[in-house]
Amino acid sequence: PIAGSMVLAAILLKLGGYGIIRMMQILPTTKTDVFLPFIVLALWGAILANLTCLQQTDLKSLIAYSSVSHMGLVVAAIIIQTPWGLSGAMALMIAHGFTSSALFCLANTTYERTHTRVLILTRGFHNILPMATTWWLLINLMNIATPPTINFTSELLIISALFNWCPTTMIMLGLSMLITASYSLHMFLSTQMGPTMLSSQTEPTHSREHLLMILHIIPLVLISMKPELVI
């Protein structure tokens, strides 16, 4: 069910990150180099999850694997135990909670009209539902952390923290971000562009679906531009 996917991606997936933050507080303050293998593992896991996204044919699976890749960045940022790293990790968890939830919502909107989640069968929506295409574009832009959303703020904090700690991590981080942009573009083009496969009359988008997307997008922009609202 779509509600379960949205709650799982937005809230339950973040409990692991919260648990790691709590555990790091009670661990002894060891020399940070001890954690290098774990940081490399987290970033490598993010890259592998991103590569898995690129070869997915199922829309819901693609969004689920994108959640895994973002949590790899969160884990790497938490492990280095710096104020910027922790701030970036918490901001990315909030940002990705809204973004992945919105993506699952859009995937369900597509599924209700096509009755399939296979990417090659869901193309051509920009001709039929132009407003839904606008939401797809906005949410995909947020997924690749474009300003002025909190996604951009959080990834900037994480990149700064990791670069200050070990400049070499930029190679893995940069590769991860490049693949993220690639699969986001692939997801958008696969669902929106090209000739439509739908033969019957398609139901138009409803006001409740537009409202749901607005309620996902407004917090992402507001928290970034006025963080004192939540801090």
Curated annotation (Swiss-Prot):
Q: Which InterPro entries match?
A: NADH_UbQ_OxRdtase, ND/Mrp_TM
Keywords, A to Z?
A: Electron transport, Membrane, Mitochondrion, NAD, Respiratory chain, Translocase, Transmembrane, Transmembrane helix, Transport, Ubiquinone
* Domain of life the protein comes from: Eukaryota
Principal localisation = mitochondrion
GO molecular function terms listed in the Swiss-Prot or TrEMBL record: NADH dehydrogenase (ubiquinone) activity; ubiquinone binding
One GO CC annotation, please? mitochondrial membrane
Give a yes or no for keyword Electron transport in this entry: yes
Instruction: Name the enzyme group at the top EC level.
Output: translocase
Q: How does it sit in the membrane?
A: Multi-pass membrane protein
Q: Which PANTHER family match?
A: NADH-UBIQUINONE OXIDOREDUCTASE CHAIN 4 (PTHR43507:SF20)
Question: What job does this protein perform?
Answer: Core subunit of the mitochondrial membrane respiratory chain NADH dehydrogenase (Complex I) that is believed to belong to the minimal assembly required for catalysis. Complex I functions in the transfer of electrons from NADH to the respiratory chain. The immediate electron acceptor for the enzyme is believed to be ubiquinone.
Name of the molecule in the record: NADH-ubiquinone oxidoreductase chain 4
Species of the source: Tropidolaemus wagleri (Wagler's pit viper)
